[in-house]
Design a protein with these regions (language model features):
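Catalytic nucleophile-elbow at a beta strand-turn-alpha helix junction centered on a G-D-S/GDSL motif
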Residues: 6-15
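Short, flexible loop segments at the rims of nucleotide/cofactor-binding pockets, characterized by
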Residues: 50-54
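C-terminal accessory helical subdomains adjacent to catalytic cores in phosphodiester-
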Residues: 1, 14-46, 56-224
Length: 224
């Protein structure tokens, strides 16, 4: 079985990898070892912990040991939204243009910086919580509040797709969820909803995620 090491941004992504991604990839012959969480900070409000990335050197410093682990493959689950300003190629990626093309270019730059043949970089477009917009009805049912689905559908329609919901400080996916659900808890509600929505629905609505998942699934058929 092919081994895969993961560097993830925070606790929400860690839970998603453990509970949703790992069992899915196991069906394809890929064993995901417990992910490494890049950084977490306990909130003063008592609302759990928040992931985040402070600078490029922090990312590189945490990735390099993974690239030295024998025949294992390495991947990441980091948000495009909120990347540190010194991330290689980020200034150009924040300019005008198709977000999907920009994030792919940024991932290519990421791969070049690490220069490791078994590294598969992935940056969630625009952030992890965008995947929840794949199934607005499931989000509404989870919180038991009317009209949430309508508002999420409206956001998706306006952007064009869940992954295209933008970088605005008040309009990025997590901000919109918090505006709709004041007590949204990213480390519990987010991963729970991901399980309810399921991989199939997320990949159908999020082509950038689907590209990454296809690549990871294919590892099961490659020689170690």
């Amino acid at each position: 079985m092919t081994r895969l090491l993961m560097l993830v941004e925070g606790q929400s992504e860690e839970i998603f990898v453990k509970h949703t991604l790992t069992p899915h990839l196991a069906q394809h012959g890929v064993y995901v070892q417990p992910p490494i969480v890049l950084w977490t900070k306990r909130l003063h409000s008592g609302g759990g912990v928040r992931g985040g990335v402070s600078n490029w050197s922090q990312i590189r410093r945490n990735l390099l040991p993974l690239t030295r682990d024998g025949d294992a493959w390495v991947s990441t689950l980091l948000d495009f939204y909120g990347l540190p300003e010194d991330f290689p190629g980020l200034p150009e990626a924040l300019g005008a243009g198709d977000p999907r093309e920009k994030v792919i270019t940024l991932q290519e730059r990421f791969a070049a910086e690490l220069n490791h043949e078994r590294f598969i970089p992935f940056l969630a477009l625009h952030e992890f919580e965008a995947w929840l917009f794949s199934a607005p009805a499931a989000v509404e049912a989870h919180f038991g509040r009317a009209h949430i689905a309508d508002k999420l559908n409206s956001a998706v329609h306006q952007a064009g797709a869940p992954e295209l919901i933008n970088h605005g400080s008040d309009t990025h996916p997590k901000a919109q969820l918090r505006n709709l659900v004041g007590d949204y808890k990213e480390t519990s509600d987010g991963p729970t909803l991901m399980e309810k929505i399921g991989i199939a629905a997320i990949r159908a609505a999020c082509p950038h995620f689907d590209l990454w998942l296809n690549r990871l699934e294919d590892l099961g058929g490659e020689a170690a």
